[in-house]
Curated annotation (Swiss-Prot):
Species whose genome carries this gene: Corynebacterium aurimucosum (strain ATCC 700975 / DSM 44827 / CIP 107346 / CN-1) (Corynebacterium nigricans)
Keyword Ligase: yes
Gene3D superfamilies for the chain: HUPs, Isoleucyl-tRNA Synthetase, Domain 1
Designated name of the protein: Leucine--tRNA ligase
Record keyword GTP-binding present: no
Family according to the record: Belongs to the class-I aminoacyl-tRNA synthetase family.
EC identifiers of the protein: 6.1.1.4
Amino acid sequence: MTNPSDNTTHRYTPELAAQIESAWQQYWKDNGTFNAPNPVGPLAEEGKELPAEKMNIQDMFPYPSGAGLHVGHPLGYIATDTYARFNRMLGKNVLHTLGYDAFGLPAEQYAIQTGTHPRTTTEANINNMRRQLGMLGLGHDPRRSVASTDPEFYKWTQWIFLQIYNSWFDEEQQKARPISELIKELEVGKRTTKDGRYYADLTKEEQRQALDEFRLVYLSNSTVNWCPGLGTVLANEEVTAEGKSERGNFPVFRKNLRQWMMRITAYSDRLLDDLELLDWPEKVKSMQRNWIGRSRGAEVSFHAEGYNIDVFTTRPDTLFGAEYVVLAPEHELVDALLSPIPYEDDVDKRWTFGHDDPKEAVEAYRASIAAKSDLERQENKEKTGVFLGTYATNPVNGKQIPIFIADYVLTGYGTGAIMAVPAHDTRDYEFATVFGLPITEVVAGGDITKEAYTESGQAVNSANDSLDINGMSKDEAIATIIPWLEEQGVGREKIQYKLRDWLFARQRYWGEPFPIVYDEAGQAYPLPESMLPIELPEVEDYKPVSFDPDDADSSPQPPLAKAREWVEVELDLGLGDGPKTYYRDTNVMPQWAGSSWYQLRYIDPTNDEIFCDLENERYWTGPRTEEHGANDPGGVDLYVGGVEHAVLHLLYARFWHKVLFDLGYVSSKEPYRRLYNQGYIQAYAYTDSRGVYVPAAEVEEKDGKFYYNGEEVNQEYGKMGKSLKNSVAPDDICRDYGADTLRVYEMSMGPLDTSRPWATKDVVGAQRFLQRLWRLAIDENSGELSTTDAELSEDDLKHLNRTIAGVRDDYENLRLNTVVAKLIEYVNYLTKAYPKGAPRAAVEPLAQLVSPVAPHIAEELWKRFGHEGTITYEAFPEFDEKYLVDDEIEVPVQINGKVKARVMVPADADQATVVGIAKDDERIAELTAGKNVVKEIYVPGRMVNLVVK
């Protein structure tokens, strides 16, 4: 490789930095410097012994935005690259690459806005992102990079979907098993169907339906979040608390549709319990615990009109106080329980929503709440509802209690029905007060004439002929009433979860097609693996049919339905009936599909036989109990990304991975052993008097106020982005300062897990540090080495060894800001101590120490020191423990609490010795002459205080 600094100034300028960076990036590319070998398969290296120690480091799957990157985006990428480079220097085999999560709503919306096909815009965006990240010198293994939009990738997304589809969850074994094993058990009568029938007694069609009730993927007519403005349905997690779409902020309505669902609820306990095995931030664990929402209580049946209304309650001890039942307006029993006749004359008019007929009242009420979010429905101060005209029986006292629908009850939690105990629940109390319903005290301790009493207390008014819980505490009453409910056949103990099954379909174009076809009768059939991938057809009209955002009555019309030649196919599925006409599913998978398993494809990206060879997976993500303890779940060693993915991506990925583990395809129980949430780089933005954002770079500050074109503007602090006109491109910083400068600056800004403000004016500080580093090794006039062969002094050895020890510990613990601080401190020491040339033995290790965070300049210095090849795999410097302990320490000496001098004392000196040295100090002796020292205080290693009079 040619010397990048030939025929140019020898000062470390942005121009020289650019030459050095370009040359070394080309060297890394040409030599496959960051290629990590696998144990087996296409990426294995024959004749090479695989390092026993490995490190699998991963960034969260980025979406390739059309807007390109701003300087906030690379923060995590630089951090993981720094950590990866450090671990390579420890002799570990490091897997570090970056792919692109390119399917989904954002890419499609961008394509629609620009009028360009999403494949074209996506490929262009990926290329631009690769270009921008390439400037930073990130040490990725390019052979392992994938995009979720590559057919070679989504072939395996479809394959995994089929594995999940063809599986069921065995409650006894608490694991997924192939559906073929269930069929065998059903055929011999070892198991019955969900409703207790024998499989052999069923018709073929009934058998298919019975199996679908077990599958981990199933079609369901269920209430979904319909967003007319986007023309698609959304998962609960994609809807904001205000009832708007996360993408585009459009209104979202509740609607019954037939959709693919994934039975993630089967894994509720494992998803919850296995959080304890993970090295994750407690905040993220808490968010997942709350989302899964496990609670213990009882399921109780209220008989009504030939049906059982099942309700879940954590307080079955209050059953005697249940005065009415409330169903969610979308509950499946509402229409069946509606009275077919008009309301009786004596029905309270407050119960009828202004109508004489229950059916009309329910229809009007449903329409009135269609646009309300779940949060609005739960927090709504005004309690509303409709009486169905029918009654349910309270199972503990036989009382006939009215059945209502009300928006504060949701289908997404529990059974979608509640027993209302107004005396002891605030919302029930408010509802009962508004509607004039009875309020019966069953827990002593409060004044229910004023408000609901929601604390624990002794049971009162709670007895029948065979049950008496009066006088019992809450726990005792619950322990007594549940067995009674079970004996009577009207209830049972139950654990309930907030977690709902995962809505797994979108009415869009830009997503993975389902490997499913339907016959003329609408029956679904999985396609054989030999037909994968089912490629997304190229269509001219890829736009979804969107509607007026407020049109709640609209229905989805997927764009793929327009591709008739693709939809209608002649296939022989090997069912014994020969070729038939089938119809492809015109929905696509949600944008979370590819990111639910991509970490496994990074391991084996070119394998055509399987998504990831088990031996390769075991090496890179398998449990390592000797290193991480007996309960190590395995997984990626370090996963870095934002906390915003705590519930969505991370929960879905854990679910998919656990199914693959149960089926024997992976050895690790969890996808990610360690999670680290990086903070964000934020910036100031400015708005004029109209509230319009103005370019931040053109705003001037005068006397604490901010001006744009002479007009005063308002300053606000938060995100960085093009829409806020405060975006700074990494391209510009790399051009004006150099990539290493950008890397050092971003790592120095503060702890990695906290957010920090961007300030372009401060970047020069990182540049000056690298210039001082360069001058320690290179003569700026001649370009030759400026170091000497002098031996290191004791002081040099202390500074060097302490820097090595401190920097190593900081790298290991991702304290990258203090890494930079320690390196700056050491460079400053050498600069001051050796203005005319520092010893080579002091500077050469510095190139190794700085290499993870500023790799280009480190490579160049290493080469200038006469080394061949790359610094990447040079061993990280070792330190000598003896230089980490001081022989002497400096101790401040106070007189009456004020520091008057500082003295050097032996590090292990006792109080008498230290005080004696302090008193002998010339300055202290002068100040205490002729005075009485009445007290001597010594805080070991910290200070001496002499109290004198």
